[in-house]
Amino acid sequence: MVLLYVPPVQNLLRREVTAYASKATGMQIQVERIDLRFPLNLLVRGVEVIQQPDTLLSLESLNVRVQAWPLIKGKVEVDEVTLSRVAVNSADLMEGMKIKGVLGRFFLQSHGVDLSNELAVINQVELSDTHMQLLMNDTTTTPKDTTASAPINWKVALHQLKLKNVSFSMQLPADSMRMTAHIGEAAINNAQADLKNQYYDLKKFLLSGTSASYDTGTAQPTEGFDASH
């Protein structure tokens, strides 16, 4: 176990694992650097997954810092999860849909996740310069799942959420429907969710520089209210 913290061993494992994964999947998988520091501080840089002619994933950096001792007590203390400059393209991996987009920066800090009591405190979440597209090629409905699911009793407290320059678009070519939404800036402070009792509240919600659009069909928009645009 101690050997995992030795840089030459980390480099050897990085080369062997990426070579095996590339051969097993038929993709070109590259990882520039993997750095694991004591006790649980993981840094990954320069990830690229290519399935010709598409680049399915490129990631500049991922940094995860988790406190080790609380895990023994069934608690999770996340000092940092940071993702920087990520690009995804599902290409033809998922039947009936395609996801493509970029993520500029994502940051999460969470102190107070109690697994046994189903409690979670999320101190800070930030997402910026992120733009995702969803293209649905098949609108066939799937049978409703009637299997009973286990009850969810989690209580979640979110102290601070910030969004900046975030957009999402969805297109259904079969019926020419297009939806887009862009958030210039948004912030949520002191939000709570009790999933068992379906109770939700928040103290502050701020939104600015935001737009949304909905279009269906190929006809040009008409003056006044137009339900298709």
List each model region and its residues.
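N-terminal type II signal-anchor transmembrane helix
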Residues: 1-26
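Intrinsically disordered, low-complexity segments enriched in small/polar residues
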Residues: 139-148
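Flexible beta-edge/linker motif
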Residues: 33-136, 151-171, 182, 187-216, ...
